[in-house]
Amino acid sequence: QFVRGFWPFCASVFVLMLLSDGFRPALFVAIRGYSKPENRTRAVTLLRLAINLGFSLGPAIGGLIITHVSYEGLFWVDGISCFAAAGLMLVALVPKRSTAEEKAQAALAKGSPYRDRPYLFLLFSSILITIPFLQYFSTVPVFYSEVHRLSEFSIGLLLGANGLLIFLLEMPLIKYCEIKGFSRFSVLRFSVLLFALSFVVLNLFPVHAFLWAGIVLMTMGEMLNFPFMNRLALDRSDRGQPGAYMALFTISWSVAHIFGHTLGLNLIAHFGFTITWWCFTCMLAIGAGMLYLVERNMAREHAGTQKA
């Protein structure tokens, strides 16, 4: 609100993003501390629902405030809402006292995420999977507009279906997977297959109806992938400092954001949409291969621990 000039504005955005990105690992660590181990996946899913709800309501509320008040009013409401959230956390989240067993486990868990090879492979696979996923919010809308000549309203309906499906189906879907006892890596591999199929549909079926099939496949993959990927990272953080582990996991998302949008737009500019979608399908296949390596490494570790 009070910043004037390009570079001061850049500095203020940097500070804002630094604080917000520092908040995300703390959220994951809080889930680890306040939820039971068997409920971690659903706890992450509930957190994702809250974030998606904020993303859905935020632009609409912000637009109303800008229209009827001003940008300054938006900044004041935004700041006050952050203070309100902090106050709610202070009141509602009672500091949890560690038990003697938890303190003993924390004393033994001195692992570093930078020396945890399976975890680093997991992060790399996460980047390879997230980059294609992000295309649905950057380059795929361009594809809708330029190739299929969809209006902004139609594009908004397609993207809005993503949020609606997540709101209605994600929690029941995760609960179903847990009841059936599907392994996490099986669910992750299936989710990557759904991501890949969403791009294959865009290439092989250039019909408007199949754009809906693509967004449904992508959304189903998203609902299955990210809760279980977060759960794997949370469980792995038991080996060391949870904050360091989850901060590195958050960084992997930031890396995907940094390179994903630019990579997609440049591929389209040089090779067109069809080759770009095949490239991202291949990237997803590599990501699935990395997940297989992670699963093998973790299984080998588990077998070695049992022998010891």
Kindly label every feature range from the protein language model.
Residues 14-51:
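Cytoplasmic helix-loop-helix junction between adjacent transmembrane helices
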Residues 94-123:
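Juxtamembrane intracellular "pre-TM" segments in multi-pass secondary transporters
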Residues 179-192:
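Cytoplasmic membrane-interface "Motif A"-like loop-to-helix N-cap segments
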Residues 75-90, 277-292:
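Symmetry-related core transmembrane helices of the 12-TM Major Facilitator Superfamily/SLC fold
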Residues 1-4, 193-206:
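C-terminal ends and interior cores of transmembrane alpha-helices
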Residues 170-182:
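Helix-to-loop junctions at the C-terminal end of transmembrane segments
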Residues 8-22, 210-224:
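Hydrophobic core of transmembrane alpha-helices in multi-pass small-molecule transporters
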Residues 138-154:
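Short amphipathic helix-loop junctions that connect adjacent transmembrane helices
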